[in-house]
């Protein structure tokens, strides 16, 4: 019998790339003419980004700049969860953007069910915030990866630790 092959499914965001994207967005905001005299800012906190601006229109522009820089740095926009827009001091508006790290229990159940329903001969096991997929054939594992890439999930997935 062939030795089992396996890989892990994770959802991770490179914190350093996020920091770089935030710094680039701040630089662009400082140089853009439409932000002259504006008190708009982007702050990075642990696991989140805080966007502050004069009004909702400028906040939308700040969001667009940040998203463009994130995509340029290779960070998927599915890794961002936008909070609601709230009032801040002095006619300002604030929005919190959470960075999604790890696979939640609900998403792990969805992914496991999707794999089981596909009838591909592999086993899945949830290990904390990641999922281990193992099977006898490497082709089956590649079929699972293709299946998950096509699936419409609301999180960004990475496939790591491919062992055969």
Swiss-Prot record:
Keyword Cell membrane: no
Molecular function, one GO term: nucleotide binding
Keyword Nucleotide-binding: yes
GO CC terms in record: cytosol
InterPro entries: DUF520 (IPR007551), UPF0234-like_C (IPR035571), UPF0234_N (IPR035570), YajQ-like_sf (IPR036183)
Key words of the record: Nucleotide-binding
Pfam families reported for this sequence: DUF520 (PF04461)
Summary of the function given for this chain in its UniProt record: Nucleotide-binding protein.
HAMAP family to which the protein is assigned, alphabetical: YajQ
Protein family membership: Belongs to the YajQ family.
UniProt-recorded name of the protein: Nucleotide-binding protein Helmi_22490
Naturally occurring in which organism (per UniProt): Heliobacterium modesticaldum (strain ATCC 51547 / Ice1)
